[in-house]
Amino acid sequence: MFSVFPIMREYLSGCCASGLNEALLAQEFGKEVHVYAPAFKAHEMRDIIPISHHLSFNSLAQFRKFKPMLDAAKVASGHAPSPGIRVNPEHSEVEVSLYDPCSPGCRLGIRSDLLEGEDLTGIEGLHFHALCEQDSDVLDRTVAAVEKRFPRLLEQVQWVNMGGGHHITRKDYDVDLLIRVLRTFREKWGKDVYIEPGEAAGLNTGYLIAEVQDIIAAPTPTAILDISATAHMPDTLEMPYRPHIFGAGLPGEHPYEYKMGGMSCLAGDVLHGFSFPEPLRIGQRLVFADMAHYTMVKTTTFNGVPHPDIAIYDPATQEYRVVRKFGYPDFRNKLS
């Protein structure tokens, strides 16, 4: 959300982007732009190079393909992003395979055996991303795996990007250990070190307001909402996970249990496992929490389900400001 960039600029040194579109948006942030993608296209690279500070490649083949473009840009304009490669530490503690970047055979990052005997001249950075919603103890063990598998590369590079997945804003996150890990690594290797807060920058933010439209009788009744799990919060079905609804408990915690049904025609557009102290009513509003990260960015216009307006709340003034409204033109123009 570029509308909150002024707030984010106070805390972040830049953005990590996946491809051209995110890089262009990151440029609007006004600070460092670091770009990584599983693969780049030449016509995209012409636009990425001028606006990027670091550029991480997913393979040696990609690095070698685009190294001449980087060299040419340096000669022509005096600027080229610092090139690095993404490696696979082959150390995984992520429990959900969908989000495990170090699973066996994963396409993300280069294994150490594929670097043996290779000419690594010109590679200035090492990038790894192995965490997902995890604490600093996992990073500590992952760093040890990187040091064990990639010592030659670590000696050579100027910077190391330790990727995302760090839940640094979670209340029980061990920030002191994170600081020790980063300081110890920098003192040992003498490199510039980066981490990507990612989700942590928006953890526990964003509320999705739903309204009960109908209630379908069944052994476990279904409340039909004016939102959709598959269109508005697909991560709840893909991961899957049970989102938090204010005032709702787990099954058996309260006397009235419901499923939450979405507005699409997908039979599985349903969320399970909610109980309430009182029966739900048609017209009643339900508030889903923690709906900003990995939710808004993955929304779809499937089935023409309308998108909710986006508003920003200022607690100092207790005012809401609507920054985006969606309508039929957005649905129509998405495809053709």
Give each language-model segment a name.
Residues 1-159, 171-173, 181:
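Active-site-proximal beta-alpha core segment in soluble small-molecule metabolic enzymes
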Residues 4-6, 136-141, 169-179, 204-214, ...:
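Short glycine/threonine-rich loop-to-helix capping motif typified by GTGT followed
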Residues 82, 107, 123, 161-163, ...:
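Short glycine/serine/threonine-biased micro-segments
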Residues 130-131, 160-169, 197-200:
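Glycine-rich beta-strand-to-loop/alpha-helix junction loops that act as flexible
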Residues 179-186:
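Glycine-rich and small/hydrophobic secondary-structure elements
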Residues 181, 192-336:
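Charged (often Lys/Glu-rich) extended helix/loop segments that serve as interaction or gating elements
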